[in-house]
Amino acid sequence: CPCGLCGEELFMKPTEEKTRSNPSDLPVYLFKQGNNCEAYRYFGAHIEQRAGETGVVFRVWAPHATAISVVGDFNSWKPGSHPMRKVDNDSVWELFIPGMKEYDVYKYCVTTRAGDLVYKADPYAFHAETRPSNGSKVYDLNGFVWHDEAWQNAQKKTDVINGPMNIYEMHAGSWRMKEGGLPYNYSELADELIPYITEMGYTHVELLPVMEYPFDGSWGYQVTGYFAPTSRYGTPKDLMAFVDKMHEAGIGVIMDWVPAHFPKDQFGLYNFDGEACYEDPNPKRGEHKEWGTMVFDFGRSEVQSFLISSALYWLEQYH
């Protein structure tokens, strides 16, 4: 793990015997301690094989839910047809669905303690539908071929903290448009941007938030997908291509990450299982009244794992 905190030598001993019989115990244990720095590798939707069948395993944290099912086009969005089970007799739910594949759309149908059904996007999804739809999409991050080894090696020999920097901050959706007013996708944007950045002498480009968000008119500061680049400009691998091209051109990439608050959109983190999970349950601390947004419960271990994992995810997966 890039944070250096999740090392086996630090955290294996308390659950050593349990993890021999059930390997999933360790990521759940670390998650609940606030020390799972790569929670996205366990939670969310992951393509894998079980008993010779390829499918997708779904895992989600919902401590107050009485039932959860995975719904999507594959089951006509019918609640209860694919029920999840608890993996820890407490708050983490799991289901493997054979036959599901990349780009399949899904949500979690959560039954609250009040008996209501709420349909939620996956907090750990890597990809999402483009507005106005807001479902999550199964996505495989593997397979992108990076070409930025020279950049990575140069960074190891450079004083990146004290060295000179000249940063160009920009909004990906409005910096420059195609004919007809359509935005460039991530990869195309790099091709347009590199000559300008080079000519103007900038060392880095800083993107206003590109994590998934609901409102086109915003700059992206109310995030609904902390592990998903917004699909307005393409797929996760398109964003990888953007970073790769920038690095090949000798340009660093800085991403604007927003843990300060999150919106109240019903498909998002807000009251995820009918009650406060990600937000502070104290109304005096849990809401930005002036923004109409929620504040994370920074003292909750599971939220700490979520946010630390998000920050490190972008560094690890997008270089």
What are these regions (language model features)?
Residues W61-I68:
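Short proline/glycine-enriched turn/loop motifs at strand-loop junctions of beta-rich domains
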Residues I68-V70, Y106:
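Short beta-strand elements bearing conserved aromatic residues within extracellular beta-rich modules
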Residues E149-N162, H171-H319:
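Substrate-binding/active-site clefts of carbohydrate-active enzymes
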